[in-house]
From Swiss-Prot:
The gene is nfuA. Involved in iron-sulfur cluster biogenesis. Binds a 4Fe-4S cluster, can transfer this cluster to apoproteins, and thereby intervenes in the maturation of Fe/S proteins. Could also act as a scaffold/chaperone for damaged Fe/S proteins. Binds 1 [4Fe-4S] cluster per subunit. The cluster is presumably bound at the interface of two monomers. One of its GO terms (molecular function) is iron ion binding. This is Fe/S biogenesis protein NfuA. Its cofactor is [4Fe-4S] cluster. [4Fe-4S] cluster binds at C142, C145. InterPro entries: Fe/S_biogenesis_protein_NfuA, FSCA_dom_sf, HesB-like_dom_sf, NIF_FeS_clus_asmbl_NifU_C. GO terms for biological process: iron-sulfur cluster assembly; protein maturation. It comes from the Bacteria. Belongs to the NfuA family.
Length: 184
């Protein structure tokens, strides 16, 4: 979904009126690294249109975005911000949290749990909070293990933060009960 403010629509229409007929807007969005998306507004000639793009129709123009980027994005908001004597286009990209949750869950499953399984344990992603803290729960040999806190802070949290820079930290919600299956 693309939301364009009234002032941004007017601004873009004014820019496009100076171009040849049939010129529209393309949002060029790139996944530069694991977490950060960058976006540029470019002119887009109707001749470039093909099945790789999703088209959004507005009254005076169309906006094209590559289809494959919508696996990361929930919505895009375009607005105008006045700075000094000039207007500046501001683009805000709202990413899908579900996608981040799936990516972190898969990371835990394949990178973290492959190490924990040597101790007969594993960890599961429970949730990602709005404040970007990951909520985890230990199972098997990790539940009740005296090294669980160290494993959480020095191993799991560091790996997750390194691979997902927007994540602020990790919280363990396990009710640790030492048992025969606990590793230490």
């Amino acid at each position: 979904m693309i939301i364009i403010s009234k002032s941004a629509k007017h601004y873009l229409s004014k820019l496009l009126s100076k171009k040849k007929k049939g010129t529209n807007i393309k949002l060029s969005i790139e996944n530069k690294d694991k977490e950060n998306l960058t976006c540029q507004i470019k002119y887009f000639d109707k001749k470039e249109e093909n099945f790789n793009y999703t088209k959004f129709n507005f009254i005076d123009f169309k906006v094209y975005v590559k289809k494959n980027i919508f696996i990361y994005i929930k919505k895009i908001k375009i607005d105008i911000e006045s700075k000094s004597l000039k207007d500046e286009i501001i683009i805000k990209i709202f990413k899908k949290r579900e996608n981040l949750k799936n990516r972190i869950s898969n990371f835990i499953k394949y990178k973290i749990n492959s190490k924990l399984e040597y101790h007969g344990g594993f960890v599961e992603l429970i949730d990602i909070k709005e404040n970007m803290f990951v909520i985890l729960k230990f199972f098997g040999g990790c539940n009740g293990c005296s090294m669980a806190k160290v494993t959480l802070k020095e191993g799991i949290e560091k790996e997750i933060k390194k691979n997902f820079p927007n994540i602020k930290g990790v919280i363990d919600i396990t009710d640790h009960i030492h048992s025969e299956s606990s590793f230490y």
